Amino acid sequence: MTENGFRKIALSMQGAIESAHMGHPDFRANGKIFATLHDDKKSGMVKLTPEQQQDFLGEHPEMFVPENGAWGRSGCTRVILNKADEEAVGEAMTLAWQNTKNNAKKRNLKT
């Protein structure tokens, strides 16, 4: 998978926009990041739950690894682009997008 392939999947999510922070592209829904492309041009990140992350690490250990530190422990998952396939990334990206949408609904219920 290429950076453009990753970008295309991210932007196919309803309401997704491309923005940037810390010098690299990110993808947002409801103002919240659900995926990013890393500076190294070799990897991206999808924001999964820890449980979802474990599923993807178990099913596709060559494609997905936890991000470093607390981000990884919270579910942020690195996608190794040259090992990734469109179907698996699409599934992970959809979950990351849904997580962002669900978190937005929870925030709205609290206000």
Q: What is each of the regions a protein language model found here?
A:
Residues M1-T111:
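Charge-dense, helix-prone N-terminal extensions
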